[in-house]
A protein has these predicted regions:
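Glycine-rich, mobile lid/loop segments that gate access to catalytic sites or pores
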Residues: 113-221
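Glycine-rich anion/phosphate-binding loop at the beta-strand->alpha-helix junction
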Residues: 15, 21, 199-202, 206-314
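Short acidic, glycine/tyrosine-flanked loop/strand segments centered on an H-E-D-like triad
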Residues: 99-124, 305-323
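Alpha-helical support elements that line or immediately flank enzyme active sites
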Residues: 21-33, 128-150, 223, 227-231, ...
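Glycine-rich, N-terminal phosphate-binding loop and its surrounding beta-alpha-beta segment
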Residues: 44-104, 108
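N-terminal, positively charged regions that mediate nucleic acid binding
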Residues: 1-59
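Internal helix-turn-beta structural module
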Residues: 300-364
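A short glycine/serine-rich beta->alpha loop
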Residues: 11-16, 119-130, 215-219, 274-279, ...
Length: 364
């Protein structure tokens, strides 16, 4: 089965290719009555669209969203919401030299192995432009969650060897890298200039902090909340690893260091630390959820690379076209969107976890 849908209760299906006529998504399960406009969605899409700085692809796309269904007089109707963004600046001719070549770091070979056929123009469904549907849907989920007091703070934690040393939330939108540290952003720019001069690319780390999530979301076995979030974020093409809370560092800690203690504050149960990152036993504990996504370097580089063709010839390949030297800044909102979709789906699933919750919904 070709899986292009995410979620069980708040379901999103993305469609379209990088060089097709359009891309988009269909959302099924959004409740009626949510105030929603194209402007709400456009704010999210503008954070990932190309051409925002010299460190992103020169492809000029407005990425203007159209709501085709599911909204009437500014409110969601409870029926499927169809969202579309038209492609306007494709240059398929840039990909003529790779029609039969397997680009290192791309999905060309694996698509051929699976389907026996592939759309080589920009990678088709494996292109980063597929995330347009995710981001548009994530904007809807984020607005719904905001109405429930759940918010996100997502930013670039590092690019290549350059990591943030300070955290100023107001700085995130003041630089091209969405870094909460102006000094680190300047150093990242210098590092990327060297990468570009060497016809190379860079990766990095994105951190997402989610506040306001109530205790109780997720399940104890196969649909753990951390597993749902990890699946959501790992489904992003450039992401190679995800960690929650202290992540891989817990392997080097003692139990006395890793365990989060509990205390009572204002008649509420609180934790004295948050090494678990807001999730214990697969279930949210009410504290801030902290997730990090590790993003690989952009595989499209201009350096000659050794590869083979689908006919079995060994060749040296130079990739031309318009490509990002680093995808991390544009992926920040993609990570946030996928987290929003996962939290929304878990929230809806949790509405039937207890009889008293069902009785509260249907009380006369």
């Amino acid at each position: 089965m070709n899986k292009s849908s995410f979620g069980s209760h708040f379901t999103v299906t993305t469609w379209g290719e990088s060089h097709g006529k359009a891309l988009g998504a269909v959302i099924d399960g959004c409740p009626a009555g949510l105030s929603l406009s194209e402007e709400d969605i456009q704010k999210f899409l503008d954070r990932r669209k190309p051409g925002q700085s010299r460190y992103t692809t020169a492809r000029k796309e407005g990425d203007l969203v159209e709501i085709l269904s599911g909204v009437f007089e500014g409110k969601t109707t409870g029926t499927p919401i169809s969202l579309m963004v038209r492609n306007t600046d494709q240059r398929s001719r840039d990909y003529g030299n790779i029609a039969y070549s397997y680009r290192p770091g791309h999905a060309d070979y694996t698509f051929d192995a699976k389907y026996g056929f592939r759309d080589y123009r920009g990678g088709g469904r494996s292109s980063g432009r597929e995330t347009i549907g995710r981001v548009a849907s994530g904007a809807v989920a984020s607005k719904l969650l905001a109405s429930l007091g759940i918010s996100f703070c997502t930013y670039t934690k590092s690019i290549g060897p350059v990591s943030i040393e300070n955290f100023s939330p107001e700085e995130i939108n003041n630089n091209a890298f969405y870094m909460p540290d102006a000094d680190a952003a300047a150093k990242a720019g210098t590092y990327l200039e060297k990468c570009m001069k060497n016809q190379d690319s860079a990766g990095g780390v994105i951190e997402c902090r989610i506040t306001g999530v109530p205790a109780g979301l997720g399940n104890p076995v196969f649909e753990k909340l951390d597993a749902m979030l990890s699946q959501a974020v790992m489904s992003i093409g450039a992401v190679k690893a995800v960690e929650i809370g202290d992540g891989i560092h817990v392997a080097h800690m003692n139990g006395s260091e890793d365990n989060d203690g509990f205390t009572i504050k204002d008649n509420m149960i609180n934790k004295t630390s948050n090494h678990a990152g807001g999730i214990m036993g697969g279930i949210s504990d009410g504290s801030e959820i902290i997730l990090r996504a590790y993003v690989k370097p952009t595989p499209s580089i201009s350096q000659p690379q050794q590869t083979v063709t689908s006919q079995g010839r060994q060749i040296s390949l130079e990739i031309h076209g318009r490509h990002d030297p680093v995808i991390v800044p544009r992926a920040v909102v993609v990570v946030e969107s996928m987290c929003a979709l996962a939290i929304t789906d878990a929230l809806f699933a949790n509405m039937t976890s207890r009889l008293d919750k069902i009785q509260k919904i249907y009380s006369k």
